Amino acid sequence: MKNNNWAKTILYVHKYLERITEGIDKLVEREAMNSYYFSSTRENDVTKVANKIIELTERKKRLINLKVLTENCLKDIDNLQARILIGKYINEEPCDVLAQRLNLAERTFFRRLGQAEESFSKALCRYGFSDEKMSSYLKGENWIFDVYENFMGEEKQLA
């Protein structure tokens, strides 16, 4: 990967994936119930309802796969690196608190953070998820692209 922005994005959104997939379940249930109760209206023809449910189910599968991919990549990298990434991106701990908890000097922490992000990016690539693949795989998830754009903006400000 050219930069680690997808790695940062995937790690950051991980904490929301389970809740969103549960929300998708509720949407599927609501679609099914609405089609049952309002089957006489034109808006709820069987094909339209089926396509909507299939679309939601595919979205749920994609998000579950993203969650599993994230967890597998974290297992594949060094334990300390995984703890750094989980603390920073998933638990959103302040860097100084995380460095202290891990018994690292701040300078060492930031050096290790960069190494951890790079290791995670390489793990994503080993699973076949380059920048281009990640962009196409998550094409319909605008909220994830918003997070990605925020990391891109931060990178441009630092340059």
Map each language-model feature to its residues.
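Short amphipathic alpha helix immediately N-terminal
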Residues: 76-93
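Generic internal hydrophobic packing segments that stabilize the cores of diverse globular domains
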Residues: 67-71, 81-82, 95
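Polyanion-binding and phosphate-handling cores
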Residues: 64, 107-110
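A general secondary-structure boundary signal
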Residues: 20-24, 80-84, 98, 113
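Histidine kinase transmitter module recognition
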Residues: 73-77, 108
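DNA major-groove recognition helices of helix-turn-helix
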Residues: 109-127
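Helix-turn-helix DNA-binding module
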Residues: 91-108
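N-terminal interaction/assembly modules
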Residues: 1-73, 121-159
